[in-house]
Amino acid sequence: LHVGLNGTWPESGRRLQWTAKQQWKWNSKQRTAQQHSGVRGLIWLDIDQPGYHEISFSMREDGTEFDRWLMTTDPNFAEPDGIGPDESPMADVPDDAVDHSTPKVEPRGEDGTGDVSLSTDPTQWETVTLTLDGPWAREAGDDFNPFTDARLDVTFTHESGDFTYVVPGYFAADGNAAETSATAGTSWRAHLLPDVPGSWSYEVSFWKDNAPLKPFDGVSGSFDVADGKPDAHGRLEYVGERYLRFAGSGAYFLKAGADAPETLLAFEDFDGTVANKPGVPLKTWAPHVDDWNDGDPTWQGGKGKGLIGAVNYLAGTGCNAFSFLTYNAGGDGDNVWPFVRRDATFAYDCSKLDQWGIVFQHAASLGMHLHFKLQETENDDQRPGNQPTALDGGALGPERKLYLREMVARFGHLPALNWNLGEESTQTPAEQRAMALYLAEIDPYQHPRVIHSYPNQQEKVYTPLLGEMSELTGASLQNNWRASHQATLRWVKASAAAGKPWVCANDEQGPANFGVPADAEFGGKSIDYTPHDIRRWTLWGNLMAGGAGVEYYFGYQLPENDLNAENWRSRASSWTFAANALRFFQENDVPFWALDPADELVEAPATAWCLAGADAIVVYMHDATQGPAVLDLTDFTGTYTVRWFDTVEGGELITGSVETVNAGGKVELGTPPTQREGNAGHDWAILLTR
């Protein structure tokens, strides 16, 4: 603690030192270079004139609490007991006895004209950006906070009347902040993702201090949207089933990708991004700089290549998803937040968020699904103890509402994403429901809303949130790598029975210290399972239980771990196996959305799982060398063609020892067309079609 006198900070008042923790304690010691715990008798103020004097205090350490101050002229004064003597009366200071100064307020810029500009040549399923030349503001405004004192909404309506979106807007500084790092300006934005071509109209609602602000409020106009690409998938939507579906193509979606690093956005090329923990430095993503391609986006003279390249690499493997925390202040990484400062929860960093948006938009252009993890267990509430970074202490208050609105306004236009209420959420069910409901109210595109839990708290967390009135659309599952099938099956069935089927993905694999292991060439600890086991038990375990796919977590004790990873090649084999699984379902037109888990239909010497429908059946065998599987087709009719899929090598379907089977009883499926060499295992997927 530093003690000042009349606006000065004398050396004798500096570095008042305590060493006690979690208790109130009187002390009068000054920290020195030789004695960090402090030396008595070195702290004093020399007041050489009578009259009014101002004593000031400056806190040195975050987390230190300071409650009472005692002054004496006795150098031998003993430390008091308890709370000390009664407080002295405050001096009755005449108003003119001390100098007053007006706080510094930087000059305002001129307000904008109210003109609107739009993206050029907008097309169906491509983002249309509306920019309003609005009131001048700065991120950390003194007299006008653009995040709390104003609200922009833009209503977009298609000429047919069938599509209307009320889209939250946001303050965008000078409109080019990713390049300029601007903190002030007159640009305000909203984004539309148009479902259909044709004429669209817009009307601006702009309120300041709870009243419409002219000439900005009420600005309106129209624009034409051209036909999009005929094969465009469009927006990924929850449609009341256990799989998401694209609104444009009608295709159902399975995902596979990266859950790690959770600190993906702790990237040194983003403005205002700092590392708070020595063991969790900012990322360069240097191993992926060479994966950046000519024509890919950058900012500020070539920044961003590492992370853009990483996204290119992951998409190039055939995977289609990755996740990231957008707020981890006070958490494991403590290096990602959208604010201008870690604790400035009502002032958002325009340039940083624009730069995030460049990465997200590029990922979307590659068909990637973006998993927004909005918080983590360390900062979602106050239950573990005092956590100042928990927005509103875990409740749905002004901090949390603004945060969610800013995320929706800036990134909700992206076609494929989900909002995850939090990693390992420990908020109360009421708090979780309130957060999900608020997202549903402000997100015009109704992106899927999911929640993540500790493995041993799933019953406690998920059960109260089930039901047809739930605002959630899915579960982000964390389980031991070997328990993926059972856990997915549990919540697929429980959610359907409760009246609203959930989309259930396996997004984190235990044990927490290992997760999905790196490939052998990356070294690290020797553990008793391999990427082949992850393929057999985690990947196919989820898919064969009616799950929506996987994201892979990297643990915290293995190379390229959950906090410091910046080389996705460390899990190259796992990406290959996952992409093979996606291709099996997609390229062979497997109607997985019409198949139900039916493990009871298959008998095999080793573990086997089944998804069954009238026209297609998938059987997954963990070890096809143990003998043929027997499939009970008593309740089925017709003749089925039997083909095998190599889960390791991928490729086309091939015929084994049995080409067809007739339904009406139990049938043997035969043996696979080849036997694998080495330690890759002998798992195969079998597709039966009629």
Roles of regions detected by a PLM:
Residues 241, 249-250, 469, 545-547, ...:
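Short, solvent-exposed coil/turn segments at beta-strand boundaries
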Residues 52-54, 306-309, 488-491, 628-629:
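Short alpha-helical segments and helix-capping/turn motifs at coil-helix boundaries
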Residues 103-106, 139, 500-504, 511-515, ...:
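Aromatic- and carboxylate-lined catalytic core of secreted/periplasmic carbohydrate-active enzymes
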